[in-house]
């Protein structure tokens, strides 16, 4: 402590040499340093309770705010977990819907292919029937044409071979046959 006084004394002496208007009194009792320190300690003691209660109130508010934030965080985490569960369920539903849609599309495609096969088979059957009918009609027409040509050829040959005497013989034989039948 003695060293401190000496330091103050040196500073005040040096400082007083530099500036005569400002001075440092090294006597504690005259300088009221002791009074200021007592006042300061008294203020600290009195204000300790006041500031302590203010700090306690502030601490309680901070703790309450932190607990509210933690509660909100917990609620947010719960909502997040619930949302994740809903997302998983939604993804499962989407997957199921996509699978069902794919199965339905395959069934529809197979149904269309089966119906197309049946329609093609019907068309083939109808085409075959049409071909058979057309062949029969063509065969009939060919037979009629051949018959007509044969009759025409025979009649032209008969006309060329049959003269008047031959016609008379045919007429006579036909008359005789008719008499015999009667």
Swiss-Prot record:
MF term (GO), any: proton-transporting ATP synthase activity, rotational mechanism
Main location: plastid
One of the Pfam families matching this protein, by short name: ATP-synt_B
Transmembrane intervals: 33-55
Keywords, sorted A to Z: ATP synthesis, ATP-binding, CF(0), Chloroplast, Hydrogen ion transport, Ion transport, Membrane, Nucleotide-binding, Plastid, Thylakoid, Transmembrane, Transmembrane helix, Transport
Keyword Disulfide bond in record: no
Membrane topology (UniProt): Single-pass membrane protein
Keyword Ribosomal protein in annotation: no
Cellular compartment(s): Plastid, Chloroplast thylakoid membrane
Gene Ontology cellular component annotations, sorted alphabetically: chloroplast thylakoid membrane; proton-transporting ATP synthase complex
UniProt cross-references to InterPro entries, sorted A to Z: ATP_synth_b/b'su_bac/chlpt
Family to which this protein belongs: Belongs to the ATPase B chain family.
Subunit structure: F-type ATPases have 2 components, F(1) - the catalytic core - and F(0) - the membrane proton channel. F(1) has five subunits: alpha(3), beta(3), gamma(1), delta(1), epsilon(1). F(0) has four main subunits: a(1), b(1), b'(1) and c(10-14). The alpha and beta chains form an alternating ring which encloses part of the gamma chain. F(1) is attached to F(0) by a central stalk formed by the gamma and epsilon chains, while a peripheral stalk is formed by the delta, b and b' chains.
Further details from the record: In plastids the F-type ATPase is also known as CF(1)CF(0).
PANTHER family in alphabetical order: ATP SYNTHASE SUBUNIT B, CHLOROPLASTIC (PTHR34264:SF3)
Protein role: F(1)F(0) ATP synthase produces ATP from ADP in the presence of a proton or sodium gradient. F-type ATPases consist of two structural domains, F(1) containing the extramembraneous catalytic core and F(0) containing the membrane proton channel, linked together by a central stalk and a peripheral stalk. During catalysis, ATP synthesis in the catalytic domain of F(1) is coupled via a rotary mechanism of the central stalk subunits to proton translocation. Component of the F(0) channel, it forms part of the peripheral stalk, linking F(1) to F(0).
Protein's recorded name: ATP synthase subunit b, chloroplastic
Organism: Antithamnion sp.
Organism ancestry: Eukaryota, Rhodophyta, Florideophyceae, Rhodymeniophycidae, Ceramiales
Gene name of the record: atpF
């Amino acid at each position: 402590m003695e060293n401190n006084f000496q330091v103050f004394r040196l500073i005040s002496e040096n400082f007083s040499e530099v500036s005569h208007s400002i001075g440092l009194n090294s006597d504690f009792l005259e300088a009221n340093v002791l009074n200021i320190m007592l006042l300061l300690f008294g203020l600290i003691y009195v204000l300790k309770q006041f500031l302590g209660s203010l700090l306690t109130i502030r601490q309680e508010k901070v703790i309450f705010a932190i607990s509210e934030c933690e509660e909100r965080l917990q609620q947010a985490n719960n909502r997040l977990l619930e949302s994740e569960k809903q997302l998983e369920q939604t993804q499962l539903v989407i997957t199921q819907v996509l699978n069902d849609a794919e199965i339905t599309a395959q069934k529809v495609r197979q149904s269309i292919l089966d119906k197309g096969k049946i329609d093609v088979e019907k068309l083939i059957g109808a085409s075959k029937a049409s071909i058979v009918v057309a062949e029969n009609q063509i065969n009939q027409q060919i037979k009629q044409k051949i018959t007509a040509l044969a009759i025409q050829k025979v009649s032209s040959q008969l006309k060329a071979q049959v003269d008047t005497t031959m016609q008379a013989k045919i007429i006579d034989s036909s008359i005789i046959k008719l008499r015999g039948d009667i």
